[in-house]
Amino acid sequence: MAKSRPHIILSAAVSIDGKIATHLGESNLSSKMDLIRLHQLRRVVDAILVGKNTINVDDPLLTVRHAKGKNPIRIILDSSGTISANSKIVKTANKISTILVVAERAPRNISKLGKKGVEIIRCGRDKIDLKKLLNILQKRGISKILLEGGGITNWYFLKEKLVDELILTVTPYILGSKDAISLVQGEGFGKISKSPSFKLKKIERMKNEIVLYYAS
């Protein structure tokens, strides 16, 4: 039986102590080799998905630059519709397909982003309904999504058991701090028996980094 949602791959670069960003928000952990690997992955998926914090803090383009290939659709989850119109992703929305997903309660004036080329999908009353959203995306022909965080967005997908693959690049840094951003934020699982479990499929060494490939 075919899945009613796209295949989800969560990919992230983490420090030795499991952080994806410092307490000041710096997140450029990957080496050039790992960026090439990531961009090779980006070019074979239908869409890249991130949360609003990733846009607000990192202001990424989410394009394919370190490898040859087409740019995937860019999807941003932002329940309240607070993404900045001056972000790189909005400024390039007329050239690269970009979807902003908001909750029904989001203000109507976010429609102005539509004039900049951003498609807006309302999904869920007070917060975004992930399962409903993925069903919508599947019907639109989006069958493979690369989830690139951040920690809160990763949590919601893992909580709903919506992650099929996990690719982690362990970088040679230790960031420390209780305020640094972990791979998975949110409320967390109180019991190990309730948490999702993954099978380690492959280990790849790239000089001073290790890439771990897991499947659900």
Question: For each predicted feature, which ranges?
Answer:
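Enzymes that bind and transform nitrogen-containing heteroaromatic metabolites
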Residues: 1-216
